[in-house]
Regions:
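Conserved, well-structured core segments that form the ligand-binding/active-site neighborhood
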Residues: 1-13, 17-138
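Structural motif
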Residues: 32-34, 141-145, 176, 264-265
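A general structural motif
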Residues: 116-135, 146, 150-160, 209-211
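C-terminal catalytic subdomain
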Residues: 152-229
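Extended hydrophobic packing segments that form well-structured cores
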Residues: 232-280
Length: 280
């Protein structure tokens, strides 16, 4: 968020929202956005103008945009926040952008530079081609690996990978997550630990809206749907308290894979989006 004294009024959106942004941005002669094109649980697809808002606005804008995501919507479905950030980019006069598509580990798969609209379309097409996971039916077992990307291993990556698995695994099936997560849990994650059942945490998560609202919601949603086995560097007691089953070694993963009629393997799970193909 930008300090209130450094904010300047840009304009009002079609919906009547008064937009305040960093003064240097509003008064700049030329603005070039730089960011990552990626799937996003709130916006559908993050990139181009989403780097501007709400991050470079005030605390109120950030709080208003902070949500649990939309499990029922796909990345191509219309999202009010995504429409707003694109309108803000237009109001600001942004025309040129540089965007990156994540590759394996800390590498970039593709880099795009050019006019905002054309890069948005090209990046979206590349993202779907590289990172959309489509299955004809739900699998009994989903094994999903999380790479160490530029952000390291954080709860956000775990949550994103679990959201993909939630879309692809059968009810009561098994999800096996390979991660090196060792990060301390945030307030939202701790709400799950304090609950008798994972789904009991969803309402207080909405009410309190902690900084880790999204990954906490993603975790609470999947452990109520399937058995989740986690290989990580977290303490096994913490994993148990999150209603997941801790794995101590790769050998434990091998044993789990011997059971089950159908298994889906996904690499770089934090960058993906899962969907079941519509019937013909």
């Amino acid at each position: 968020a930008t300090d209130s004294e450094q904010l300047a009024y840009l304009s009002s959106t079609v919906g009547g929202e008064r937009i305040y942004l960093d003064r240097d941005l509003v008064e700049a002669d030329l603005t070039i956005t730089v960011g990552e094109i990626a799937f996003d649980p709130v916006m559908g697809i993050r990139g181009t103008n989403s780097v501007l808002y709400p991050g470079l606005s005030n605390v109120e804008a950030i709080a208003k945009a902070h949500g649990q995501g939309h499990l029922e919507l796909g990345p191509n479905d219309e999202r009010a926040l995504r429409q707003m950030v694109d309108e803000i980019g237009w109001l600001l006069g942004v025309q040129f952008t540089v965007q990156v598509l994540a590759g394996e580990g800390t590498s970039a798969s593709e880099i795009f530079a050019g006019l905002d609209t054309s890069i948005c379309n090209a990046g979206r097409e590349a993202l779907f081609e590289k990172s959309m996971v489509t299955s004809p039916e739900r699998a009994e077992i989903v094994l999903i690996a999380i790479d160490q990307d530029c952000a390291g291993h954080q709860w956000n990556q775990l949550g994103a990978a679990l959201a993909t698995a939630r879309s692809l695994v059968a009810k009561g099936g098994k999800v096996i997550v390979l991660s090196e997560l060792a990060m301390e849990p945030g307030d939202g994650i701790n709400l799950i630990r304090e609950s008798r059942q994972a789904r009991d945490a969803l309402k207080p998560l909405r009410q309190q809206s902690p900084p880790d609202l999204i990954p906490a919601t993603q975790i609470a949603s999947i452990v109520d749907w399937a058995e989740v086995y986690l290989l990580s560097k977290l303490d096994s007691t913490l994993v148990d308290e999150l209603f997941m089953i801790p794995l101590e070694s790769v050998e434990s993963v091998d044993r789990l894979l011997r059971v089950g009629d159908s298994t889906l393997f996904i690499a770089g799970g934090q960058h993906t989006f899962g969907e079941i193909a519509p019937p013909n």
